[in-house]
């Protein structure tokens, strides 16, 4: 159960609690949710099973997995792509994760709601552009992640997941109950659950596919790394379903928590990424016991962030540990220091380095663009092609059925899907994210 919860924690994180609600809000609500769920089932689960197979069969880190399965070839570069993507994502995720600790502290100290007529937009911008405070909180969050990683898989990651995942659900449920009892909460629930198919454009469909890919941590090596710790009797098909269902449930609960409150206070649902740090403090400020609800929410967000940073950190740590034959403590320290150093530039890009751009983007945004729009789709697509074309199908079936003890009636369809359908679907997302699809179609 611990390894399943750890894998759930790998997939469930900021992508579900922070990114999903504002993506849903920006893409029309229920119609986006419906398409998102379909993609989670028909694309997410098969690709996840594939990454589970690679990890458990090879019993190695992301690079080592491809080296063992295709020695002497260039396929190992899929692993290098995943590790680099995880490292880069961790560097800027740690900045956002640090913000969650700042808001927990502001709430506990009474500062967030202890001042009359506070401008939450200016307050957030002042904090994010500060040279020292965001870096301090980023360092604290990296230190917390480092502590869990150094404790190892069983004592650290699995134990933390056993505690955090049930707590995450409990806090989400408490916040959902509070949100749906607000005036005009029905409008938020209708937005979330009543589809308006007139809003279902090609852009919304592709955004839903991209969010499904992002939510399940596909293509960044996390699932390959975690599945390398699976037991030989782990049912990888069932685990993929469990992870996907729990991930989707968390995302939907996050929507129930946020949108009734947004509609209750007349806030636009497409407020964007700042919904969490600018819009929601305004909402909490108008509630009785505002400090309590705010504190509960930001603790929830910090926990979601920690599940993300742990999984990303473990990808890089496992590689350094195994490939360079280091102790876990030394490997984790190297990764933590590297992440902290790179994260400084992401943090400063909101302030003193705002004028420094890479390809017209601030440093933080450039890393997000590089990883989310190029490295992850590319890695996922190549992984599907690798399994569909290079892996012995007898070996694949034996592994996925635990040497014939489990049934896999749709194995033939699964192989066809991985060889043709999944790479094409992910390729479409890849081309869309780069803007190439719009250029080709002229739309």
Language model region names:
Residues 2-39, 224-227, 238-241, 245-246, ...:
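Transmembrane helix-boundary motif of multi-pass solute transporters/channels
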Residues 1, 158, 162-306, 324, ...:
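Membrane-embedded translocation segments of transport machinery
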Residues 1-7, 32-35, 74-87, 136-141, ...:
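Select transmembrane alpha-helical segments in multipass membrane proteins
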């Amino acid at each position: 159960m611990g390894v399943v919860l750890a894998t759930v924690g790998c997939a469930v994180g900021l992508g579900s609690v922070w990114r999903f609600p504002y993506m849903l809000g920006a893409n029309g609500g229920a119609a986006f949710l419906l398409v998102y769920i379909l993609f989670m089932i028909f694309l997410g689960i098969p690709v996840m099973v594939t990454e589970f197979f690679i990890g458990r069969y090879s019993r190695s880190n992301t690079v080592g997995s491809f080296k063992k399965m295709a020695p002497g070839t260039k396929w190992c570069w899929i692993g290098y792509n995943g590790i680099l993507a995880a490292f880069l994502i961790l560097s800027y995720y740690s900045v956002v994760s640090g913000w969650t600790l700042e808001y927990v502290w502001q709430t506990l100290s009474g500062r967030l709601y202890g001042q009359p007529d506070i401008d939450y937009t200016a307050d957030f911008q002042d904090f994010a552009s500060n040279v020292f405070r965001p870096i301090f909180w980023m360092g604290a969050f990296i230190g917390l992640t480092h502590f869990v990683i150094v404790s190892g898989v069983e004592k650290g990651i699995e134990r933390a997941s056993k505690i955090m995942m049930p707590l995450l659900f409990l806090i989400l449920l408490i916040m959902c109950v509070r949100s749906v009892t607000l005036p005009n909460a029905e409008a938020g629930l209708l937005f979330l659950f009543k589809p308006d198919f007139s809003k279902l454009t090609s852009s919304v469909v592709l955004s839903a596919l991209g969010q499904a890919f992002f939510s399940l941590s596909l293509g960044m090596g996390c699932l390959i790394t975690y599945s390398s710790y699976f037991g030989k009797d782990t049912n990888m098909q069932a685990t993929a379903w469990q992870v996907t269902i729990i991930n989707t449930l968390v995302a939907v609960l996050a929507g129930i928590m946020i949108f009734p409150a947004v509609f209750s206070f007349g806030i636009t649902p497409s407020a964007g990424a700042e919904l969490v740090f600018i819009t929601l403090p305004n909402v909490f400020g108008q509630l009785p016991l505002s400090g309590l609800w705010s504190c509960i929410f930001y603790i929830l967000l910090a926990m979601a962030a920690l599940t993300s940073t742990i999984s990303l950190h473990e990808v890089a740590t496992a590689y350094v540990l195994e490939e360079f034959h280091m102790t876990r403590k030394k490997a984790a320290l190297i990764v933590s220091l590297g992440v902290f150093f790179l994260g400084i530039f992401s943090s400063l890009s909101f302030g003193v380095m705002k004028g420094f751009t890479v390809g017209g983007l601030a440093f933080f945004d450039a890393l997000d663009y590089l990883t989310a729009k190029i490295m992850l789709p590319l890695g996922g697509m190549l992984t599907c092609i690798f399994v569909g074309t290079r892996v012995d199908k007898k070996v694949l079936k034996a592994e996925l059925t635990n040497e014939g003890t489990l049934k896999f009636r749709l194995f033939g369809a699964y192989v066809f899907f991985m060889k043709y359908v999944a790479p094409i679907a992910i390729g479409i997302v890849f081309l869309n994210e780069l803007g190439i699809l719009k250029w080709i179609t002229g739309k």
